[in-house]
Amino acid sequence: MRRRISAIIMTLFMVLVSCNSGGVAEDPKTVYLTSIANLGKGFLDVFVTFGDMVAGAFGIRADTKKSDIGKYFNDIEKTMTTVKKRLQDEVAKNGNYVKVKEVVDKFVADVLDKIAAGAKEAAKGATGDDKIRKCYFCWAWSQSADKDSVISLVKGIKTIVDAVLKDKGDAGATKTGEDKKDIGNLFINDAGKDGSKRENIAKAAASIGSVTGADILQAIIKSKENPNADSVNGIEKATDAAEIAIVPAVNKTEIKEDTAKKDAVIAAGIALRAMAKDGKFAAKNEEKSANAVNGAAASAVGKTLSTLIIAIRNTVDSGLKTINEALATVKQEDKSAEATNPAEATTSGQ
């Protein structure tokens, strides 16, 4: 990412050199290109922060707090807002270059605004000082995630995915076999806690490992925005990832609905329950089982967030390239009305 941004900045400076090589006094076009080049240097500082975000996503651990996930989304929102402001400030001062303004406006509306809005909404769902594992040696039964928190995560992630991933990934991805029927033990109540043993938890880990982060994200965004929780049948009636996340702890262990018996959906449900307020998992009262649950939860969240931030980086990188191409077009069209008579173009743009 740093090398790509550096290349963009170098191109901008080459444009400046070619503009000034004739010894002509600064005109609005030269001033504009100079300001964009300076903005490019600012990009290098702003977008390098994405590297820290990626490190944070890959560094998800069982003892990561839910509020840390919320901060992660808040940081994404702040970064997008900062970039938007810098771009719009420059466009406001140099509005006579219509082609560049159109590209920047589209980038802001289609990418930056959507990512920022989605991140802001998702952050509402990841709150509290509980750790994402929330399964301890002393904690035997599960607890459903707060419904409103899950809804915020689903809505927010959907907005981001629509901007950066589109239809990449498969919400119905599934590779494991009948073992999936035992994964419901993660959501059991105290009466059935002995079924939440390492052998069954390993089946959940297998589901998570068999799908991609994009598959998990697609399963999340295809969840209902108003999920239902069956207090009698529990996991047996869960139909999607959001409903798995909020399933009440009852003495039911088998995932029966065909729409939920998908590895991507199961992994997405575990990720949502781990990130959302109050969500907890069951484990047999032994250290090896507790560690297995913690590892599965961390894996699901880490894979989800890592894929999301990489997609954000790639999309923003692509947007910057498009802006750079627009700048190159302005240079090549010096004979256009806006370039051959900068003073008139500036006046007409005011």
Swiss-Prot record:
The keyword Transferase does not apply. Genes for both Vlp and Vsp families are on (usually) unnamed linear plasmids in B.hermsii HS1. Keywords: Cell outer membrane, Lipoprotein, Membrane, Palmitate, Plasmid, Signal. It comes from the Bacteria. A lipid is attached at residue 19 (N-palmitoyl cysteine). The gene is vlp4. PROSITE patterns: PROKAR_LIPOPROTEIN. Belongs to the variable large protein (Vlp) family. Delta subfamily. One of its GO terms (cellular component) is cell outer membrane. A lipid is attached at residue 19 (S-diacylglycerol cysteine). This is Variable large protein 4. It is found in: Cell outer membrane. Its main location: membrane. InterPro entries: Borrelia_lipo. It is a lipid-anchor. Pfam families: Lipoprotein_2. The Vlp and Vsp proteins are antigenically distinct proteins, only one vlp or vsp gene is transcriptionally active at any one time. Switching between these genes is a mechanism of host immune response evasion. Residues 1-18 form the signal peptide.
